[in-house]
């Protein structure tokens, strides 16, 4: 059928080239369709007798390239091929989920400074033909999500990160803005991906560090960005985009405002974000335990039962396969929770109470000998600060909590946190609270960056070019890059 339609379409193009659609036919195309006499054709030629829905289906089968070319045939074809629904259909056939495309183009197309509304119904109508055309020529980008524990990197056009590495083992603390360390880290990524830095833009996921609203913390954040941009432009990268990790995790959940709870490698951060901006002035709460502490605590529990293992990586794998968060810790202790998993090269491991006791230190840190605030208390404190802040807009913006980080993928965490918050907070704050699990698992921030990299206005709205960087550095000094 598709081959036959292409032959028919070829004849339409040939007629157009031969002048088969005179100017008077254009006016006919715009008027209501009338029955055609035998042998009489309108502006669509022999296809004029077909219903509109059949013609639309023909354009769908022909594909976006031929649909775009059809606009040059005559006014009737131009009207058909410009239909928003047709180009929405083509976008749905693309690699990115449709709802993510709509969210990105609606809320992120203007760049990091402008986010028009939180929900689709308050957004301007998109021209999907324009969006499709622009997205088709957006260059592929390198995405680097380098946290203090682990790094993910890959191409923006790929479905998932193509490489991972243990940042803390290979490169040390990359959150410290040292030129040599960052250059070594980024050079290694480019080498492993076998690409030249000068050939494509890069998106760097900024780590959650120096999050206080103090003068020294602001200076540290500026210094980190300064150093990062200097390293990349010295490597001749054509364009750079850098976005906070928590903001990207929020974007991955199709939100521009909310609270992100990131269980990082060494610490857990509770980050309030309003319209794509981290609200440092409200306060980023930090709990001094993260994924490493959970893994270390499971290691202690396994050693107490004389369970042998080769390395901390083994314990981490067991944690990811067997551990979960209990809805009710005391009730869970009365259940039979024994389960087993296999670790490649080391055989089978069986856990019981350790499965839920490991993650319980998020809510009861004293169980693991940690003097810290429970996760639910830290989040409730952040929500209380948001409630009392002078932020104009949606009064409920902080009631959406998005989890991120590898350990936030533990089953039961979102349900337990939501339950604890409802019990801890007063009704006027807790009403409407929703805790969302990591939308893309351990890679949520990476996928948030991927969403930005494919938006139709990416290079203009989100990137800074080398020439801009050099000019503004000379004019304003090195700290100007905090505006990107």
From Swiss-Prot:
Its main location: nucleus. It comes from the Eukaryota. SMART domains: ACTIN (SM00268), FBOX (SM00256). GO terms for molecular function: ATP binding. ATP binds at residues 262-265. Keywords: ATP-binding, Cytoplasm, Nucleotide-binding, Nucleus. Disulfide bonds: none annotated. It is found in: Nucleus, Nucleolus; Cytoplasm. The keyword Isomerase does not apply. CDD domains: ASKHA_NBD_AtArp8-like. GO terms for cellular component: actin cytoskeleton; cytoplasm; nucleolus. The keyword Secreted does not apply. It holds the Pfam family Actin. Residues 44-90 form the F-box domain. Belongs to the actin family. Plant ARP8 subfamily. PANTHER family: ACTIN (PTHR11937). This is Actin-related protein 8. It comes from Oryza sativa subsp. japonica (Rice).
């Amino acid at each position: 059928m598709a081959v036959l339609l292409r032959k028919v379409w070829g004849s339409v193009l040939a007629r157009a080239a031969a002048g088969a659609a005179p100017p008077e036919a254009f006016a006919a195309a715009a008027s209501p369709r009338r029955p055609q006499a035998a042998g009489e054709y309108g502006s669509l030629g022999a296809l004029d007798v077909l219903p509109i829905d059949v013609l639309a289906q023909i354009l769908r089968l022909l594909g976006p390239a031929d649909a775009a070319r059809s606009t040059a045939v005559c006014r009737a074809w131009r009207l058909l091929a410009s239909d928003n629904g047709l180009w929405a259909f083509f976008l749905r056939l693309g690699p990115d989920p449709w709802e993510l495309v709509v969210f990105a183009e609606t809320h992120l197309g203007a760049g990091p400074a402008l986010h028009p509304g939180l929900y689709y119904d308050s957004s301007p109508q998109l021209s999907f033909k324009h969006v499709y055309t622009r997205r088709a020529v957006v260059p592929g980008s390198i995405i680097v999500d380098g946290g203090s524990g682990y790094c993910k990197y890959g191409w923006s056009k790929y479905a998932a990160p193509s490489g991972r590495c243990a940042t803390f083992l290979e490169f040390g603390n990359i959150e410290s803005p040292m030129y040599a360390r960052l250059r070594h880290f980024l050079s290694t990524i480019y080498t492993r991906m076998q690409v030249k830095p000068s050939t494509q833009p890069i998106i760097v996921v900024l780590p959650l560090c120096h999050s206080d609203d103090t003068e020294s913390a602001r200076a540290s954040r500026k210094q980190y960005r300064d150093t990062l941009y200097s390293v990349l432009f010295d490597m001749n990268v054509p364009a750079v985009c850098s976005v906070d990790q928590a903001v990207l995790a929020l974007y991955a959940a199709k939100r521009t405002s909310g609270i992100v709870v990131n269980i990082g490698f060494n610490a857990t951060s509770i980050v309030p974000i309003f319209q794509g901006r981290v609200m440092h002035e409200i306060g980023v709460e930090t709990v001094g335990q993260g994924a490493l502490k959970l893994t270390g605590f499971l290691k202690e529990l396994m050693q107490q039962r004389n369970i042998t293992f080769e390395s901390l990586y083994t314990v981490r794998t067991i944690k990811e396969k067997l551990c979960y968060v209990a809805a009710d810790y005391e009730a869970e202790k009365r259940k039979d929770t024994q389960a087993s998993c296999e670790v490649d090269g080391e055989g089978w491991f069986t856990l019981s109470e350790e499965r839920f006791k490991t993650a319980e230190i998020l809510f009861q840190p004293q169980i693991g000998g940690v003097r810290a605030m429970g996760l639910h208390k830290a989040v409730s404190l952040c929500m209380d600060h948001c409630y009392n802040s002078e932020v104009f807009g949606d009064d409920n913006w902080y009631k959406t909590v998005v989890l991120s980080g590898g350990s936030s993928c533990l089953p039961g965490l979102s349900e337990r946190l939501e339950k604890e918050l409802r019990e801890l907070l007063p009704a006027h704050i807790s009403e409407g609270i929703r805790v969302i699990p990591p939308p893309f698992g351990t890679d949520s921030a990476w996928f948030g960056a991927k969403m930005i990299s494919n938006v139709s206005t990416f290079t203009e709205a989100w990137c800074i070019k080398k020439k801009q960087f050099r000019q503004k550095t000379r004019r304003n000094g090195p700290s100007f890059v905090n505006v990107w």
